[in-house]
């Protein structure tokens, strides 16, 4: 019986294989949804796919540019995609619809990490603290960008389903505070609240890297640095950055008896102090909520102006094309008059010229007049509708929201520390009011112009009827005075176009002295401090307002950026120039685990960061085919200002005959390794295995006292390498040679492995529920 039992135990295969299916393309990036059994993948030709756990494909999209990174929003409802040109695209999980494009970088976005606040929404006093957005009390739902006329369904980027998703993306009132971290190829790291409002930026080349164990005031710089991975802790207090580069400008004289790490390319780990995000998360939440909604509404105004400009330009093009032939006929008949003079002559009762008669009766005709009338006056009504439904409501809500921010800025004790500047917000608030005045003026000008065009066309119809000796008693009447004004000032002028376009320097709108005097009188009664704003066009005023917003929002961005600093540098190992592994091919994984003895005090002892990576071959002669794991534990931020109280690491030797393809930190401090067998027959499909290592059982060695710029961190571990044995770990054989990436979901307990021969294998990493229940009992 005992022999049979032992045989059964040996036959138990860990990690149930869900399926092994062929795929038509090779995958370069794969990430599981944190909340659902959904897998997002990026193909080698940069198509983004979303599959269910059963491998049913939900959608495929192509951004049109090379995809370099991908991550999920913490709630699993959106995907952030980093592109080679520095763009970050946010897509809806339901249909892949593009929600937002951001451009915080100028070069390829190589890594993304989106983390939300792990704490409950309570303030320092323990009171429930969720910021209430009061806008919905006073305003209807925010307007959407108008559709460009003439587009069929599917052509516009403002589709209904996408608009609903975008509204949800911006509605952050009851969502947990979260931050998207993005790193690019040039060493820039950007921080965006809710993934849409940029709140900070640092460059690892410009950081002062502390070395307090040698000299309290010493620091150094990284040169030729490249970021590989970033990870933000769940309390938002710490950012871990894996990067490569050369340490220079160090003020410490190296010890001659040890290897100097300066001027050598190496793999480094930086621990950044981002505690400002936790300390001021409620204030930042409020600012980001208002500012991101203002930015959305600004885009509504921009789209409205663009649509209006195009519509009016098309209508005026139709008008001028129809009436251009009159000028040609006047010249052909040897006349020296202008079209306006010909029309005024006809209006005055003079004999009609042959040119004008030919134009009205033969070229234009009653049908032509009505067609132009419909185009111009119909467009005028459409423009009025765009203003009433989109532009004006957006400007009014912006005015309310910027006023809310101005009110917050007066609470200096809480908001001055994050850069909310009252003076800049006062200016932005006034500029919003100026835009609303410009909108009212535009509506008055548009109404007047449309009325005069309509009056002109009514007169033309009556004139054509008269010339053709047809009855015209039933036709609309016209106003002769308005007609004279139109022919003198509007026939070859376009005040609507002037207001919709940006004015050049020196092309300001002329304002009479009486109007300027009224504006100055209003100043004495608390009116606008600027008196010359009416000389600007509507488009110019919008640009002026947008510029003031950027200045006001730049202050929190700059302030927060300055408060992010480096508190620890770990020079892990050198990188030989001759190595076959580039930084982008070194398997790495970063994660944070909650401490068991934590008292839930953020920024002190809440989370331990784990860093796992494959040690590149040729790094050290004594270390080959090894996996490095380091963990940092910051016990008390008050006592240890610039570092951790504990830094530990361990080296794992990969079993003989295997090489590491990829790795991923898993839940409960576990590490999943994907290993390829080295002695595979070239004719076969190869063989690999997936191994789960319990990091909690490993003998970590403290390296906090040995950190020095004269020695690489891994050198202390050469004599204490832990050998991984296949029989001692959970191992699942894979009947294929495998390639990166290894996609592991800690929340769902699944892993996806990709084979060289284009196959996808999905495994369930969790044990049977029956076993778990029995264990609990």
Swiss-Prot record:
Subcellular compartments: Nucleus
GO biological process: anaphase-promoting complex-dependent catabolic process; cell division; embryo development ending in seed dormancy; plant ovule development; protein ubiquitination
Matches recorded under Gene3D superfamilies: YVTN repeat-like/Quinoprotein amine dehydrogenase
Domain of life where this protein originates: Eukaryota
Keyword Repeat in annotation: yes
Family note: Belongs to the APC4 family.
Subunit structure: The APC/C is composed of at least 10 subunits.
Function, in words: Component of the anaphase promoting complex/cyclosome (APC/C), a cell cycle-regulated E3 ubiquitin-protein ligase complex that controls progression through mitosis and the G1 phase of the cell cycle. The APC/C complex controls several key steps in the cell cycle by mediating ubiquitination and subsequent degradation of target proteins such as cyclins. The APC/C complex is required for the female gametophyte development and is involved in several aspect of development by controlling cell division and cell elongation. Involved in the control of endoreduplication.
Principal cellular location given in the protein's record: nucleus
Any single Pfam family the record assigns to this protein: ANAPC4
Pathway the protein contributes to: Protein modification; protein ubiquitination
Residue ranges of WD repeats: 22-62, 63-103, 105-141
Name under which the protein is recorded: Anaphase-promoting complex subunit 4
GO terms under cellular component: anaphase-promoting complex; nucleus
Keyword check for Phosphoprotein: no
Keywords assigned: Cell cycle, Cell division, Mitosis, Nucleus, Repeat, Ubl conjugation pathway, WD repeat
């Amino acid at each position: 019986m005992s022999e049979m039992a032992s045989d059964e135990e040996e036959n138990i295969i860990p990690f149930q294989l869900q399926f092994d299916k062929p795929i038509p393309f090779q995958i370069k990036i794969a990430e599981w949804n944190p909340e659902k059994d959904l897998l997002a993948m990026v193909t080698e030709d940069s198509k983004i796919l979303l599959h269910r756990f059963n491998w049913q494909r939900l959608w495929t999209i192509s951004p049109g540019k090379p995809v370099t990174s991908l991550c999920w929003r913490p709630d699993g409802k959106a995907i952030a995609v980093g592109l080679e040109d520095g763009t970050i695209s946010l897509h809806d999980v339901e249909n892949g619809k593009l929600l937002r494009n951001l451009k915080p970088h100028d070069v390829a976005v190589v890594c993304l990490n989106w983390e939300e606040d792990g704490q409950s929404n309570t303030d320092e006093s323990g009171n429930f603290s969720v910021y209430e957005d009061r806008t919905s009390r006073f305003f209807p739902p925010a307007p959407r960008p108008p559709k460009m006329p003439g587009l069929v369904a599917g052509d516009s980027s403002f589709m209904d389903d996408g608009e609903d998703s975008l509204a949800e993306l911006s509605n952050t009132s009851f969502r947990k505070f979260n931050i998207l971290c993005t790193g690019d190829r040039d060493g820039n790291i950007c921080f965006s609240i809710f993934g849409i409002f940029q709140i900070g930026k640092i460059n690892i080349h410009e950081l002062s890297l502390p070395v307090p164990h040698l000299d309290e005031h010493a620091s150094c710089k990284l040169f030729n640095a490249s970021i590989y991975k970033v990870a933000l802790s769940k309390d938002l207090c710490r950012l871990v950055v894996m990067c490569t580069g050369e340490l220079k400008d160090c003020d410490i004289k190296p010890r001659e008896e040890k290897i100097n790490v300066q001027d050598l390319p190496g793999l480094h780990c930086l621990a950044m102090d981002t505690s400002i995000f936790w300390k001021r998360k409620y204030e930042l939440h409020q600012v980001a909520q208002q500012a991101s909604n203002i930015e959305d509404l600004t885009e509504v105004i921009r789209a409205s102006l663009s649509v209006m400009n195009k519509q009016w330009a098309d209508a005026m093009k139709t008008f001028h094309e129809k009436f251009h032939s009159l000028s040609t006929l006047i010249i052909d008949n040897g006349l020296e008059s202008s079209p306006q003079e010909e029309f005024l002559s006809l209006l005055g009762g003079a004999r009609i010229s042959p040119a004008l008669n030919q134009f009205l009766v033969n070229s234009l005709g009653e049908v032509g007049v009505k067609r132009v009338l419909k185009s111009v006056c119909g467009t005028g009504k459409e423009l009025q509708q765009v203003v009433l439904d989109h532009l004006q409501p957006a400007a009014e809500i912006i005015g309310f929201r910027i006023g809310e921010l101005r009110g917050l800025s007066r609470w200096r004790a809480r908001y001055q520390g994050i850069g909310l500047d009252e003076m800049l917000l006062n200016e932005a608030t006034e500029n919003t009011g100026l835009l609303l005045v410009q909108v009212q003026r535009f509506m008055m000008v548009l109404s007047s112009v449309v009325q005069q065009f309509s009056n002109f066309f009514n007169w033309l119809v009556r004139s054509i009827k008269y010339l053709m000796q047809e009855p015209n008693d039933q036709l609309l009447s016209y106003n002769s005075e308005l007609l004279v004004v139109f022919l003198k000032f509007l026939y070859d002028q376009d005040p609507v176009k002037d207001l919709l376009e940006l004015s050049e320097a020196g092309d300001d709108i002329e304002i009479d002295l009486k109007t300027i005097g009224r504006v100055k009188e209003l100043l004495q009664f608390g009116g606008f401090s600027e008196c010359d704003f009416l000389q600007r066009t509507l488009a110019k005023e919008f640009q002026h307002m947008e510029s003031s917003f950027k200045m006001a929002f730049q202050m929190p961005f700059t302030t927060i950026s300055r408060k992010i600093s480096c508190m620890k540098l770990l020079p892990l190992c050198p990188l030989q120039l001759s190595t076959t592994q580039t930084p982008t091919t070194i398997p790495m994984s970063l994660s944070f685990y909650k401490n068991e003895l934590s008292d839930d005090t953020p920024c002190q002892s809440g989370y331990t960061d784990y860093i796992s990576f494959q040690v590149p071959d040729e790094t050290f002669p004594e270390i080959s085919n090894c996996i490095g794991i380091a963990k940092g534990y910051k016990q008390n931020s008050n006592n240890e200002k610039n570092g951790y109280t504990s830094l530990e690491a361990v080296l794992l030797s990969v079993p003989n005959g295997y090489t590491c393809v990829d790795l991923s930190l898993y839940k409960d401090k576990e590490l999943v390794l994907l290993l390829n067998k080295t002695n595979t027959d070239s004719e076969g499909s190869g063989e690999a295995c997936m191994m789960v290592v319990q990091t909690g059982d490993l003998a970590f060695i403290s390296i906090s006292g040995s950190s020095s710029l004269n020695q690489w961190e891994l050198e202390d571990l050469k004599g204490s390498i832990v050998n991984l044995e296949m029989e001692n770990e959970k191992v699942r054989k894979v009947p294929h040679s495998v390639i990166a990436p290894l996609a592991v979901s800690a929340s769902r307990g699944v892993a996806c492995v990709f084979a060289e021969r284009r196959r996808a294998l999905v495994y369930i990493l969790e044990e049977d529920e029956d076993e778990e229940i029995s264990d609990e009992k």
